[in-house]
Amino acid sequence: MVPSLVAPAVATAAAGCHGNACEGRSPKATGCGSDAQTIPGTVTHPGSGLHPQVWLRYSKQCDAVWAQGEESNGWTIRVQLDGGASYDAPTVPSGSAFTSMVGAGHRHRVGVLDADGRWSYGAWRKGGI
């Protein structure tokens, strides 16, 4: 008997978009959220008290980023392209909220709209992790 040289198939999630083609699309619907990582140093904390945390998430397989916020009600989170589009999402009392994506190859930042109607932003950055 000859040993088999065929390896078992490994299931991988196929990304629904890549780079700029992800702009305006959902990280969940495209499968881009499956390999997402939080980019270090991108957490924004406006004010004090029970304010939402918002951070930048990056998908290597999709080369895209988006804003994600946790467990807060009545706030809006944003991912913004430098000189381009912004994508917003309302936060929710339980669970996480996320914006649509933008390609990671352009300068981008995350922000949160506070109760006084002011935006607080993280630093501009380009690329993934």
Q: Where are these predicted regions, by residue range?
A:
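Secretory targeting and sorting signals
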Residues: 1-12
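Post-signal peptide N-terminal regions of Sec-secreted extracellular proteins
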Residues: 12-129
